[in-house]
């Protein structure tokens, strides 16, 4: 009788685990994560996202941890229950055999213990693919397209396309600098002979894959590049590297994408889109791919402003081509320099330790 009760308890525990995980699976990964201290604890250090894609990834991250903890508690509970219920010392006191009843040929139990892990793995795989597809989808109809070029050890940002309502010209804006782009195209092949080089026979100095724009923001050792973007607007990023591999990473996007040289030859998807940035402010961006001596200092800033301010900013840049990015930021009432990170002198000849230029952040 006692053995039957124990077997019934184990079966109920297993059934409870199946029902519990099934409920989580049906809930889906896009259910909002818990808020407050509990949500912060379950986030395990992840920042709160500022895009819908980031929110989906954050929710998935949190619910995976919730599922893992539930499974862990169930398994720990069964382990502790078995440890105390079927101990040799307890069996000896009760005058029973040292070993409990063996269940190695309990077909229903073995089926449950095989099927449940398969369901868990399949559910996690399903929600992983679901979240990944949402994050990498190229279906946002971007109103702003930004060309991003990484190089040792800084960034260049250019506005390739801007929709009419945000454009400095009042109509759809195409920002390609045709003259510089044509010059880059000429570097594709060496002049006056065959090209015995490994990149499909192209010149080692080929820069034709890079994009050049009329309105650009270029980072220097004295000034962090500030990329100005509108809030609540679909944005597309087009990435490339001018030298070694880099990676474009904004922690609040909860997403990073590698920037390669010759991305097409490397079979890389160089573009990604976000539906909108939901919060205005300054957000630090970083290189997330080890790229040499000053990799850790290769920062930039995303400055998110209202669509109205963004249109004013672009108009100022378009009407004043000689003005600096800091001048344009001042013109719309924004801090002229990066506020989320500071410049670092990345010149290889710097050896005196004077790596911080306090005048640039003033």
From Swiss-Prot:
A lipid is attached at residue 29 (S-diacylglycerol cysteine). Binds a binuclear copper A center per subunit. GO terms for molecular function: copper ion binding; cytochrome-c oxidase activity. Keywords: Cell membrane, Copper, Electron transport, Lipoprotein, Membrane, Metal-binding, Palmitate, Respiratory chain, Signal, Translocase, Transmembrane, Transmembrane helix, Transport. Cu cation A2 binds at residues 287, 289, 291, 295. The keyword Membrane applies. Residues 197-206 have a biased composition (Polar residues). Residues 176-191 have a biased composition (Basic and acidic residues). Gene3D superfamilies: 1.10.287.90, Cupredoxins - blue copper proteins. This is Cytochrome c oxidase subunit 2. It comes from Corynebacterium diphtheriae (strain ATCC 700971 / NCTC 13129 / Biotype gravis). The lineage of its organism: Bacteria, Bacillati, Actinomycetota, Actinomycetes, Mycobacteriales.
